[in-house]
Structures are given as C-alpha cells and as structure tokens.
Amino acid sequence: MQAVNIIRWIDGPVLVGDSPGSKPPSERLQDTMAVSDPPVEAAGEASATRSGFWALTLGSIGVVFGDIGTSPLYAFREAVSHAAQQGTVTPVIVLGVLSLILWSLFIVVTAKYVLLLLRADNNGEGGTLSLMALGQRALGRQSLLLLALGVVGASMFIGDSMITPAISVLSAVEGLKLAAPEFGNYVVPLTLLILVMLFAVQSRGTASVASAFAPVMALWFVAIAVLGALHIHEDPSVLLAVNPWYAIHFLLNHGLIGLVIMGLVFLSVTGGEALYADLGHFGRKPIQAAWFCLVLPALLLNYFGQGALILAHPDAIENPFYRLAPAPMILPLVILATAATVIASQAVITGAYSLIRQAVQLGLLPRFEVRYTSETHAGQIYLPRVNILLLIGVLLLVLLFRTSSGLASAYGIAVSTTMVADGIMGFVVVWKLWNWRAATAAALVVPLVVVDIMFFSANLLKLLDGAWVPLLFGLIMVVLIWTWRRGAAILIKKTRRTEVPLLDLIKSLEKRPPHIVKGTAVFLTSDPNFVPTALLHNLKHNKVLHEHNVILTIETAQTPRVDPSERVRMENISEKFSTVSLRFGFMESPNVPKALVIARKLGWQFDIMATSFFVSRRSLKASAQSGMPVWQDRLFIAMSRSANDAINYFQIPTGRVVEVGTQVII
C-alpha cells in the first residue's frame, strides 16, 4: 500500500493512502428515496436496467436540483429590479439579465459541473472534500493548498446550508401576499414555523416522506416550465437573449452596476454545486439526463416567461414568478412552491450532515454524535448538535433580513467561494490524475475558474448589504477546523515524547512477565508502533497482562468507501501481541464489532464476550508553551470535551469497555 502523510485524531483514526488494489463497493440509490439500494457500477449507470436508470434520474430530480430549481422564485426579480433602480424596466435590462442567466447556466452549471466535474469522481463519489482527497491522491502527497481549498470550500458550504432554507422558504411563503394581501404580516411567523417544524422532524428521519420528494419536484419543474411557456408569446423578443452579445453589452454599458447585477444573476446558479456533491447517490448519467431533459429546459422557459411578462407588464416586477400564474392558481402555486422549498432545504440539511461526517472522518473536526434514522439506509443520519446550530443560524437569518429580497443580498458569496475552490481542485485532477498536458488542462479549466472568480468578485460587492453573514458562518467553520488540526498536531507531538515503542515493551515483558489473565484485551490507539496509554496504565495499576493483546488502529482512507476485502489487516508480532488495522472510507460509519467479524474469518479467534476494549480518555489542560494563542488553546480543549467518545462513535459494546483517564498538558 502506498501511504501518504497522515492526519491523526485524538485516540482516533489515521488518514492513509488508498490501496491501489481496492475496489469501490456497489453504488447506492439516494438514501432519501425510500427504495432499496441497486447495485451499480462506480457512478451507477452501467449495470442499471433502463427502468433503474430512470428511477435514478427521477430520484435526482427530487434531491439534487431542489436548490437551483427554486431559484426562479427570486433570482430574476432581484437582478432586474436592481438594474432598474435608476429608472423603468427596459428591454435592454431584461434581455441583458436573461442573457446573463442563460449563459451562466450554460457555463457554470452545464460546462463546469454537468460535463466536467461529474467525471471527476472519487470511486463514484463527489463533493468538495471528495475532490480534495482525489486531488491529494493525484499529487501523491499532502498539499497545503488543496487542504486549504477543501477546508474553505466545505466551510462555505456549511454557511450556505444556513441561508438556503431561509431564503427558499421565505420566498415561497411571500406568495401569500399576492393570494391574500391581509396575510402579509404573517409571512415571517409562518416561515419561522415551517423551518422549526422542518428541523424538528430531522431526528425522526425522512424515510416515510422521502418517496414523495421526486414526484413533487418533477411536478414543480413541469409547472414552472408551463407557466413560463404560456407567457413567452406576450413578447417573443425575449428569445433574442440567447445571443451572448446582450449579456456582454449589458456588462460593458453598466459599469460597476453591471458587476452588482452579476452578483444577483449568480442566484440563478446557486445549487449547481449540489450536482457534484450528490454524484455518489445517483451517478453521472442520471444527473445529466435529469438536467438536460427536464431541469434546464424548465428553468429557461420560466426565466424567459418572466422576462416576457415584465416587458408586457412592467408592474409585474414586484413578484414576476407568482404573476405568471392566473389569480385562482396563485394559492396552489404557493403551496407547491413551499413544498419544493422544504424539499430543497431538506436536501441541503442532509448534505450538511454528510459533509460534517466526512470532515470528522478525515480528522478535520472532532467526533460528533451520529444517530441513524433508518434501519435500511445507512446514509440517513442525524447529527443533533449540528441540527441545533443550523436551526439557530437559519432562524436568525430570517429574523435579521425578514424578506427574500433582503436575504438575496446575503446569498451567493458562500456558494461562489465553494465554486472557485472546486474549479481550482478540478484543474489539479484534470492535469495530474487524468494526465492531461498542463496547457490543455489550463485551456479547459482556467476560463471556467475565471468566470467563478468574476462571480465571487461580484458577490463581494454585497458584503456590506448582508453577504458578511454567510461569510462569517463559513469563517467560523474555518477557524474551528484550523484549531482542531493544529491542536491535534501539537498534542501528538507532545505525547510522542513520552510514548514507549511497542516492540521495546514486548521485549521487556518477555524478560519480566507480569501476571497473565485469561481473555483478550483490545487497546485502541492512533499509532500501532507505540504503546497505547491504556495498556501502560493497565500494567502500572492492575499489574496484569491478558493472554491475547490486540493493538487496534482505525484508519480513514482517501476513498469514500473501502471494500470489505481491504477492511482488515492483521499482524502477529509476538505470542501475546498482535496488531489489527481497520480501514474505513471517509463516507462510512466506523463499526468496530462488524469489522472484527471479518478478522475472525481471517483466522483470529475473536469472541466478543471474552474480550475487553481498553480506551483512554484524555483530559486536556492548557499551558503557556502550547504553541497556540490562549483563546485557541481554550477553543481546542472545548472542542475536545464536546467530542463524542470513541466508544459510541465506533459502536463498541459499552459492557465490554474499560476506560482509562489520563491528563495531558498541551
């Protein structure tokens, strides 16, 4: 096995290189679709039947496209209304904004994500952290630049996961003001109620309603397509916006305002990053089919329909999306829009859970408590602390901005940051992993990254108008990850000074053996070359040694999943000592007892009822010479104390565990 530099956890796993011979497990259908997991090849298309392929395609419509699919509620309105602030709505403004939206969807979403990055799968999986791990593997070493890009991109996704539910649900509920103006004062309270209910049901899982996600979202896309198509005839000149010159002309003639409008046009592509993040759930071809066959045409028809409506009726700028519908249909459309935004929010929340779990597995964050909400789908998880923090953030955003127009100013900066990070890491993959010439890779990827940077710059102009909020959330995540990694590295360095090499201890015990007791003792450690703290304390205080002693290390590979045949590595180092290494992918939940069943098949006579697991629990105290500022020392210690203990995280039976407490000064 070719290893890369390692990242160690406190009493936890190690990040290791993947085995060249490892094989990806079968692809699984998105967990939120309440159907069984079909076996599919890598990204899930080759072995799927035609019906299975279209089931995956329909499933992706219900999960992948919720965010970008609800953008017509506010994106076009915000861009045109800001462009027309100095006067009336003109054809130049409408055609310019429409052209910008159309070509943004073509370049950012279609070219970059649908056609390029969906091919950059990490054993079938996608997402910012998966792309980071893929880039590290392509380079064959740890890269601080890639690590920084992955951390920043993932952190900004968390910031975005707070604002997406807020703006989506709020923009949907605002339709009530058209259906029944007297309900205008109840928009914010109703939005808060819906969001609280959404987060409250997370602990129960979504399996019972997940099967309805795809049909509802499919109905949503059909509805917005029909509504848009019915109005294009009011001013067919909007079709001229297909010509990119209208976008270029608009930017050239509007100066700084044009750049501000670009930041609002970007709202039409937010959610594009979800296409890559959900690659592992559905596969490349089903996502591409859903995009080209339904989602993209529906979005374009709706945006062009809004444009034609505004040219024919300039007063419709107040809420052009809902004005597309006849008066009797506004209330049903509000209900459908609310359902669509709740589904979009659910997908973002689930994505945040998954991303946090990946970060924990990669050693970027402390262990969070993970609860499983489904007996049949391992991907349906619930993180209580993360759920509470997300809910607080979402409610604060609604109370702070109170309208979707206000939130629109805050939206985009986090997503654009993630997209820039994805683009740069994508270049590394195209260049190093796909073995393209640097010039060819640059010719393909650099123009896409330049567009991302333009959108990022445009969103920076909204910093004082509210964009600082998601940026602040993202920066807090960056600080937490930086503190955890830095503190863990310092802790490992300090504890290494006092650790005893395992082979030296074994030789010493052979010369002067202690009292031997029956049974097997398993000692968890992050480095099998040194004596676990729990073993030293057992010898020091209990003065006994078990018949069989297993030094157990849990490692996290740079691949999403590890094939069961690659799960366990065993080595006998003496008559009484052996080492066992368990490898898990960064998208898997470590289950030690299940993994040890594989060890039994390899010849280890393992009886869990005659086995004791020894785990050390460290109590940290700060020192003036830690190498970190005092505030960071305290933050690291607080994060360490809040971490879920190894017993629960690795699903070890509590009745077979012996905990040994130690105090460490960092």
Swiss-Prot record:
GO terms for cellular component: plasma membrane. The chain crosses the membrane at residues 53-73, 89-109, 144-164, 181-201, 212-232, 247-267, 291-311, 324-344, 381-401, 411-431, 441-461, 463-483. It is a multi-pass membrane protein. One of its GO terms (molecular function) is symporter activity. It catalyses: K(+)(in) + H(+)(in) = K(+)(out) + H(+)(out). Keywords: Cell inner membrane, Cell membrane, Ion transport, Membrane, Potassium, Potassium transport, Symport, Transmembrane, Transmembrane helix, Transport. Belongs to the HAK/KUP transporter (TC 2.A.72) family. This is Probable potassium transport system protein Kup. It comes from Nitrobacter hamburgensis (strain DSM 10229 / NCIMB 13809 / X14). The gene is kup.
